[in-house]
Structures are given as C-alpha cells and as structure tokens.
C-alpha cells in the first residue's frame, strides 16, 4: 500500500552511517537488496496494469498493449481516495479536508475515534519534542526521533489522503505507542539505562 511509503524514511539513518563511514561495498549490497525486494512489486504492477505504481500515473515508463488507460487509472485513484473519506461520489474528490474530516470521523467506531485522537495528539507532542531536541532543551536522540517521525508522517499522510481504517490502522495504533513510549523512555531514563538501545 502507498500508505506505507514513508517507511522508506527509516533507511535514512543507516544510509548516512554507511556513506559517512565510506562503506561502499555494504552500501551497494543494501541498495541491491532494496532493488531485489521492490522489483517483484513493480513487475507485478506492470504485468497487471501496465503502470509501475498503479493507479498513480505520474510515472509513465511502459507502453504495453494491456495498459489501463490513463483516464481510468486516474479515476481509480480518485475513487480510492473518496472511498476512504466515506464518500462514493468521485466528484467529491476535490473537497477540502475541512469539509470531509468531521463526517468521516463520525463514521468511525468508538475505539477507532479514540485511537485517531491519540494519534493526532501524538503528532502534536512529537513536534514539541522534536523542537526541544533541535533547541537543546533535552537530550538529543536522533535515531528515536527518526522512528517517531516516520510513524507520525505515515499517519498524517494516510489521514490526508485516503483514511480508510483498513488502509492505515497500523499508523493509527503505532503513532501514540511509538511517540509517547519514546518520550516516556526519555523521561524515565534521561542518561544511561534504555537509551543505549537508541
């Protein structure tokens, strides 16, 4: 799912360490493994639809006979987004978030509402926590912040695009756990202790 795209941010830290340490062989191995891992996904997309990342038509590399027409692929992309927002009419695709968010939220189950609110609060808390690291108000744990930021960015991306719970429930549940868990760990173990793991 495209809602998992931000997980690629987790590769930033190891990449910086490898390149900074001039470990070119290891860098090549990991890049190769990444390509080998992603290749079946892309091949499958092309064989089924003619598009590298269906239904997104911004990357148009192949001209094959079975290619789904661009207009139909664009329609599918919009239909997926409005469906996630609780609508069935594709003409409502351009509605601003301020118009559809409250209606979407009302349709959620009680526990899902609670977790969405907790996830939103965790994003706000992470902004304050991250600013505190940047300005040196508390200990800098950049690796932890990268993990927290990746999860929070994935939640925000899911929420702003196509927030059907089954597409992004992992980000809804993980955001409060990872953000608040990391902050709690930093408070309980400001020096030493569990911080060695980060």
Model regions: which residues?
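Membrane-interface helix-boundary motifs at transmembrane edges
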Residues: 17-25, 134-142, 188-195
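Membrane-lumen/periplasm interface segments of specific transmembrane helices
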Residues: 27-108
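Hydrophobic, aromatic-rich transmembrane alpha-helices
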Residues: 16, 95-140
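Transmembrane alpha-helix segments characteristic
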Residues: 35, 119-130, 134-159, 175
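Hydrophobic/aromatic-rich transmembrane helices and adjacent perimembrane loops
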Residues: 2, 6-7, 154, 162-186
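Alpha-helical transmembrane segments of integral membrane proteins
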Residues: 6, 25-33, 142-153, 168, ...
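Membrane-interface catalytic loops of GT-C/OST-like multi-pass glycosylation enzymes that act
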Residues: 46-49, 114, 138-143, 158-172, ...
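Perimembrane helix-loop-helix junctions
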Residues: 7-35, 178, 184-186
């Amino acid at each position: 799912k495209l809602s998992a795209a931000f997980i690629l941010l987790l590769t930033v830290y190891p990449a910086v360490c490898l390149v900074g340490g001039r470990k070119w062989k290891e860098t090549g191995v990991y890049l190769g493994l990444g390509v080998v891992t992603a290749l079946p996904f892309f091949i499958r997309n092309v064989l089924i639809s003619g598009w590298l990342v269906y239904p997104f038509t911004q990357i148009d590399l192949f001209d094959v006979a079975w290619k789904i027409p661009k207009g139909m692929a664009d329609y599918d992309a919009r239909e997926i987004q409005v469906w996630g927002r609780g609508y069935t009419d594709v003409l409502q695709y351009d509605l601003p978030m301020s118009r559809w968010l409250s209606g979407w939220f009302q349709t959620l189950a009680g526990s899902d509402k609670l977790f969405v609110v907790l996830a939103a609060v965790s994003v706000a808390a992470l902004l304050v926590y991250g600013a505190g690291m940047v300005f040196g108000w508390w200990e800098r744990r950049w690796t932890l912040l990268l993990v927290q930021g990746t999860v929070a960015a994935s939640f925000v991306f899911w929420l702003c695009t196509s927030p059907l719970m089954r597409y992004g429930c992992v980000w809804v549940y993980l955001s409060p756990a990872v953000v608040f868990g990391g902050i709690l760990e930093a408070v309980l173990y400001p020096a030493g202790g569990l911080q060695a793991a980060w």
